Structures are given as structure tokens and as C-alpha cells.
């Protein structure tokens, strides 16, 4: 318990000295959270953008908002959380039948959330099991 007390003091000191965003710190070392049975809301608005799937923005783990406009209510995502990839989907002049790295500047696998990515532009990163 003493170690946790010291950690809390260091975090508060870092926030004070470096004016760090407390929201960033809370996501990096999240507090114990009760398991939420509330459903993720897709799309949701966070950090001036629409998100159509779980995100890891400001966090080490994927999470989602429980409200359309993020208001601080969130939960960690699971493999059962929607939305699912849609296969096949249209990307540029190709019909894509599985997760692809094509066109992603970070060279990560992604998929479309609709049958026509060119038209809708809705996508998510693929998980190891292509959920």
C-alpha cells in the first residue's frame, strides 16, 4: 500500500510540475473500474473526431464511449464489441477479402466497416483474430 501512496504522490507532482493532462495519466494507469455491462456507442465523438470502433487514443488499451458525445463514461473493449469487419469490401479499384495493410501509413492491418470504403470511409484496425 505504501508503494501505491508514493506512486500517487509522484503522479500529482508530475501533473503539477509539467502541467500534464490528467486525462492522459488516468488512461495510462487507469483506476480500478467496475466491469460495465453498458454497450459501446458507435460512432462516438472524442477529441474532435468521430470514431466508428474502439480506440486506443490516450490509452494503452482499446476503449469506447458509452455516450455519443464522450462525457467521461467509457469502458474497455472486448472481442465481442461491434462493429465487425465487412468482407469483401471495395477499396480503390480492388475488392478486398481480408484485413489489409494497403493504404495505411502506419503499416497496420485494417478493414472496412461497410461494403464500400471508397464511398463511406468507415474503417477500424483489425485485431489478431480479425474481429
UniProtKB/Swiss-Prot annotation:
Superkingdom, natural source: Eukaryota
Signal peptide: 1-22
Record-annotated Fibronectin type-II domain positions: 35-79, 80-128
Protein localization: Secreted
A Pfam entry, by short name: fn2
CDD domains the record matches: FN2 (cd00062)
Keyword Disulfide bond: yes
Entry's Gene Ontology cellular component terms: extracellular region
Keywords assigned by UniProt, alphabetized: Disulfide bond, Repeat, Secreted, Signal
SUPFAM superfamilies: Kringle-like (SSF57440)
Function (record text): Binds sperm in vitro but has no effect on sperm capacitation. Also binds gelatin and heparin, but not chondroitin sulfate B or phospholipid liposomes.
Protein's UniProt name: Binder of sperm protein homolog 2
Phylogenetic lineage: Eukaryota, Metazoa, Chordata, Craniata, Vertebrata
Amino acid at each position: 500500500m505504501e508503494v501505491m501512496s508514493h506512486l500517487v504522490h509522484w503522479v500529482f507532482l508530475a501533473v503539477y510540475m509539467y502541467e500534464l493532462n490528467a486525462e492522459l495519466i488516468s488512461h495510462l494507469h487507469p483506476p480500478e473500474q467496475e466491469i460495465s455491462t453498458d454497450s459501446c456507442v458507435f460512432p462516438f465523438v472524442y477529441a474532435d473526431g468521430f470514431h466508428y470502433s474502439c480506440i486506443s487514443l490516450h490509452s494503452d488499451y482499446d476503449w469506447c464511449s458509452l455516450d455519443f458525445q464522450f462525457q467521461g463514461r467509457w469502458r474497455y473493449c472486448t472481442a465481442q464489441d461491434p462493429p465487425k469487419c465487412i468482407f469483401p469490401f471495395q477499396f480503390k479499384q480492388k475488392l478486398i477479402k481480408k484485413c489489409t495493410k494497403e493504404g495505411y501509413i502506419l503499416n497496420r492491418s485494417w478493414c472496412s466497416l461497410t461494403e464500400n470504403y471508397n464511398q463511406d470511409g468507415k474503417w477500424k484496425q483489425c485485431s489478431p483474430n480479425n474481429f
